[in-house]
Amino acid sequence: MSQSSSTGNFDVASLVEDVNLRRVAQYALVVFFLGFFLVPLETGIMTAIKTNESVARSLPFAPPVGEGFTLGNIQFALEQLSGSFFNSLIMSIPATIGSVLFGSMAAYGLTMVNWRAQMGMLMLFVVGVFVPYQAVLVPLARFWNNIFPLARMIEPMVASIPFFQGYHAELVPLVITHIAYGIPICTILFRSYYQSLPNSLVEAGKIDGASITKIYRRIILPISKPMFGVVFIYQFTQIYNEFLFAFTLVTGSDAPAAPVTLVLPAIGASTSGINFGIRMSAAFLAAVPTLILYVAFAEQFAKGLRTEA
């Protein structure tokens, strides 16, 4: 009897020990990955608030001490990026809205409306997703600069808009390009969502005498809000961080219409070297708009991901 009890106690103790070891291993793994992702962030923050001399003398992740602490890097970077922030926003917001809205319409037409050559058109959208930026840079530059110089044509009109200058006309071809290039991926994302919707929604609208456009506007569009949040965040991040199209269509990083991605590489660089504190401050400031967007649309983003899953 006592032998059986001791055996039972030994088994329970072994089980508890195994569970504890497993839990310790899980927590250790979580802490490792947490540190793996947070240490570079902490290093960047420490670098942003150090003087250039303190950056050279101290460890990257060590906090600044005494005169090594400064907020001048952030102030200087903000002054350098203020104009380009406005340029990036007036480029990214309409381009994102256009590509997301047109992508939703195209996905609705390819999923919930039956018509001839539907699959062939879908294949064109799929091909459009995989066309690399580099393949269209030269024809794109020739089209907007030589064949159809839209920026020069609308410059007087743009200059008459409040808060805008004539040079902001350079961003209009960039907006159109991002809309055209973003529609395929937005269409594919929305199509996967619309495929999960029951066809009875469309059939009920048809029975009530609603047209195709009215069904989209009154039925499909309202229930697509979670997916709009997902696609809007994704597309805004892609457009805001894009470099190649901006580098091709805007005259240069010194141009008054240059977005953040063109101005950022030149900040903190001089003939005497690179000021890493200023450069890191600029990098963090450049990430603020996308961070605000993620926070603002966090609920819609989570709902969209759950719906997609």
From Swiss-Prot:
The keyword Ubl conjugation does not apply. Gene3D superfamilies: MetI-like. Residues 85-297 form the ABC transmembrane type-1 domain. Pfam families: BPD_transp_1 (PF00528). GO terms for cellular component: plasma membrane. GO terms for biological process: transmembrane transport. It is a multi-pass membrane protein. This is Xylose/arabinose import permease protein XacI. It comes from Haloferax volcanii (strain ATCC 29605 / DSM 3757 / JCM 8879 / NBRC 14742 / NCIMB 2012 / VKM B-1768 / DS2) (Halobacterium volcanii). The gene is xacI.
